[in-house]
């Protein structure tokens, strides 16, 4: 497929995205995304964009339950790629909502390897917290053991939003029956100058306290995190309705 035809497909998707624009929402949301230039924000409410992602996914082979031998543009001639594949391979995207659409499409993929392949290609291009925090593909819940290797690779990345996504994945998938204190300790050991990494560390520890209080509490008692993340985790835990008043009172004594 030539570059002109690929561009036509991307422009068609952009036209449809702008048709979903809510200008008032754009003004509001731009204030929440200080590191994204306003001209890169279209202004589409999340439920509307998710619905569009579902419509776009219909008919694409990427959303089959089982990957075929030649599924994905990485393994077939470009002429054989469908429009969703062409969009997913048109990185980097310009608009913020294109990045969100990209993530929403990956989250719908039903084949583990396909979802993982596309996610790992996309992660280095994520440039904001909202895209990063969109969630994880549902199929990952069925493959937690093999996913862990990749999660730890993300934690070791030099890309802040890849690290944030790794921590978020541990928070979403590994705080209940699959919890291991090792995961919490490894998150606590992460050292970063990046605000959005440290905020996710705090969010993870606060959520871990809500679900695994006795196991996670020593991380704060022994001051295993940097001071900023330590105090922010306590703040977020004390804001949680899942933490008891008695626990909140004790946590306040652990501030540094």
For each predicted feature, which ranges?
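Alpha-helical scaffold domains
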Residues: 1-256
């Amino acid at each position: 497929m030539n570059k002109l035809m690929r561009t036509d497909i991307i422009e068609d998707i952009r036209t449809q995205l702008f048709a979903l624009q809510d200008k008032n929402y754009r003004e509001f949301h731009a204030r929440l995304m200080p590191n994204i230039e306003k001209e890169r924000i279209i202004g589409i409410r999340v439920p509307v964009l998710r619905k569009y992602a579902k419509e776009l996914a219909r008919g694409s082979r990427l959303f089959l339950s089982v990957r075929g031998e030649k599924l994905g543009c990485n393994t077939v001639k470009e002429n054989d790629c469908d429009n969703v594949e062409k969009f997913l391979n048109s990185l980097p995207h310009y608009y913020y909502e294109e990045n969100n659409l990209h993530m929403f499409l990956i989250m719908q993929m039903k084949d583990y390897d396909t979802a993982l392949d596309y996610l790992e290609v996309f992660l280095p291009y994520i440039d904001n917290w909202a895209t990063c925090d969109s969630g994880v593909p549902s199929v990952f819940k069925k493959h937690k053991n093999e996913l862990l290797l990749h999660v730890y690779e993300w934690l070791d990345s030099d890309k802040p939003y890849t690290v944030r996504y790794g921590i978020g994945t541990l928070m979403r998938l590994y705080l209940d029956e699959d919890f291991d204190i090792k995961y919490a300790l490894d998150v606590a050991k992460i050292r970063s100058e990046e605000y959005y990494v440290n905020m996710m560390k705090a969010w993870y520890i606060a959520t871990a306290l809500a679900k695994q209080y006795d196991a996670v509490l020593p991380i704060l008692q022994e001051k295993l995190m940097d001071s900023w993340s330590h105090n922010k985790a306590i703040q977020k835990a004390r804001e949680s309705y899942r933490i008891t008043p008695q626990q909140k009172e004790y946590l306040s004594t652990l501030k540094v």
